[in-house]
């Protein structure tokens, strides 16, 4: 253990104890619809859609819902048209935030996000103000109980592995180039190794460590953003010491 928790680890711990499923299905339906619209309705030929469908199934979304979302994307069924808009800004203690949205009303969305940010000691920035701090990568989580770190690294070296993060107590986080994510999944599938949370991710080049008080403010802001139906995902460069994390959990 490094003695610190990055945002991905923090989110995983929160999800394990958070009783609210919230608007998860709404977000998943939007992602499936957009993916099908952009790349067609066949997951085998549309990697983004395949990831979205896999995520939906992992979260127990009924296949009927998935199929309807795909058909709305391909135009076989009527449905709302969503625009993907990314906002950038800063939260408490100067941490960077990237907020990805899918909306059928741009004016409503930007007004809502600006309101949430201002009420929680955050501020929106210009396009490009913080995105330079992040790199878009493929990532997935492999339970540490599945295999040893050296063996996992050897398995994935020829499948595009760029980094293997073992800071979390339970999971290794596998990081790849976006184009190699499917190769990593295939290698794990062929080896019979389970994995979770395969996704395209925004990974900070550097992290800002926060103590409990500031971390609590940032988490409150991110919770408020993610509870908005138009917000798909929030990325941040926050890192919390294990001592501060224990204080928050206590």
Swiss-Prot record:
GO biological process, alphabetically ordered: regulation of DNA-templated transcription
Keyword annotations of the record: Cytoplasm, DNA-binding, Transcription, Transcription regulation
Subcellular locations according to the entry: Cytoplasm
A GO cellular component entry from the record: cytosol
Pfam (any one): TACO1_YebC_N
Keyword Transmembrane helix among UniProt keywords: no
GO molecular function annotations of the record: DNA binding
Signal peptide location: none
Keyword Thylakoid recorded: no
Main location: cytoplasm
Family: Belongs to the TACO1 family.
NCBIfam families xrefs: PRK00110.1, PRK12378.1, YebC/PmpR family DNA-binding transcriptional regulator
Name the UniProt record assigns to this protein: Probable transcriptional regulatory protein Clim_0475
